[in-house]
Amino acid sequence: MHSCSHTHFVSFKLPHFFAPKSFVVSSRRELRVFAVATTVEEASGNIPAAPISLPQGSWKQIAGGVTAAKGFKAAGMYAGLRAAGKKPDLALVTCDVEAVAAGVFTTNVVAAAPVVYCKKVLETSKTARAVLINAGQANAATGDAGYQDMLDCVGSIATLLKVKPEEVLIESTGVIGQRIKKEELLHALPTLVNSRSDSVEEADSAAVAITTTDLVSKSVAVESQVGGIKIRVGGMAKGSGMIHPNMATMLGVITTDALVESDIWRKMVKVAVNRSFNQITVDGDTSTNDTVIALASGLSGSPSISSLNCKEAAQLQACLDAVMQGLAKSIAWDGEGATCLIEVTVKGTETEAEAAKIARSVASSSLVKAAVYGRDPNWGRIAAAAGYAGVSFQMDKLKISLGEFSLMESGQPLPFDRDGASNYLKKTGEVHGTVTIDISVGDGAAIGKAWGCDLSYDYVKINAEYTS
């Protein structure tokens, strides 16, 4: 914790985020979590809050984000990396022990320096001790000089933490083509290291520090049991624009105190990413910097997980899925210029992958997204997007519902209350709620979900004005 005389950054908790099946806020985009400078005394009682909607499960949501699990500390601070303002722009997450590490990265061939570095490190190392994240400069397309800047930062933070350089992973977000402001970053590192704690406040500061065009910070943690022992899984993420499978301008750090072997952990993280971050879309752009780093300290005392085919693995996978899906939905909800979250559920396929592919196609459709923003219950656009997903299904099995309104049955349009359906879209947008689209394509048992947001005039304005 900072001393009470120091500037501290917190996020205000907005009321009424949660509803039985979706989350809402009471006044659209004006009421959001935002960073403010205050003292710790003044900040008392303000905890990190983002509109996180978790799936149903045996876990309970708790405070703490990345510091909820045993062995983890975090910090966030302003280091002068952003173009303007005093919002935190440098974050650090550390583990007291060697944490089993996994990473999932962008599929963009124009990969940023930190992506190249992390992939290389994790090819030979099973563990990590720290993740350093900067906002402001993406350090993508910066050549050898940008890569060396990053190595210098890694070396400096490793020295301060008294760990090996290869135990430090790094993530960057910001303007493509700009190198890290190395001098400012290096100057800030001693303060950042000394600011670390396992407090909720520092977890929140870190979550704020990694944001760019985000209007809310995203942080969540859950508590459950693995093998009868209490474990925790927490995480933070950033993302608002350039969000499209596979992953997007999306950074994430996931932590757990469960004990799990390296190869199993990496497979579990990949599965969870495929069910969450790879199932969200805002604008169809895939970033150069996508990174999710997941660390497992093993300090909970839970049984070691050495196989995917055991009850303990299923218990941990469920918690991991829940945290990542909660963060992913929050990112889509916070899509640039958006007025609502769109949740697409597809049933009736033979495999989960097929259902997920159709759901992703519908959630990604610019025409569907524009129709939702225009409050137009356009079943034709939904049907078309499902049809071009690349998954074969029988037309006469197709069913489509929008909220409580059935739009299509047996591949044929149904008479429905168009004004009522339009009003459903309007009212959902007014409270920045969740529009649900349910699709059935057959008799299979598989289910897949995807999340997106509507496409508004403001999206164009925000990105037209974003600096290059």
Curated annotation (Swiss-Prot):
Site (Cleavage): 248-249
Main enzyme class: transferase
Top-level taxon of origin: Eukaryota
Active site (UniProt): 249 (nucleophile)
Transit peptide: first to last position: 1-35
Residues binding substrate: 212, 238, 249, 336, 463, 468
Name of this protein: Arginine biosynthesis bifunctional protein ArgJ, chloroplastic
Keyword Amino-acid biosynthesis included in the entry's annotation: yes
Cellular component GO terms, alphabetical: chloroplast; chloroplast stroma; cytosol
Pfam families according to UniProt: ArgJ (PF01960)
Its EC number(s): 2.3.1.35, 2.3.1.1
GO terms of biological process kind: L-arginine biosynthetic process
N-acetylvaline: residues carrying this PTM: 36
Localization annotation: Plastid, Chloroplast
Catalytic activity: N(2)-acetyl-L-ornithine + L-glutamate = N-acetyl-L-glutamate + L-ornithine; L-glutamate + acetyl-CoA = N-acetyl-L-glutamate + CoA + H(+)
Organism in which the protein naturally occurs: Arabidopsis thaliana (Mouse-ear cress)
Record-stated family: Belongs to the ArgJ family.
Bilayer-crossing regions: none
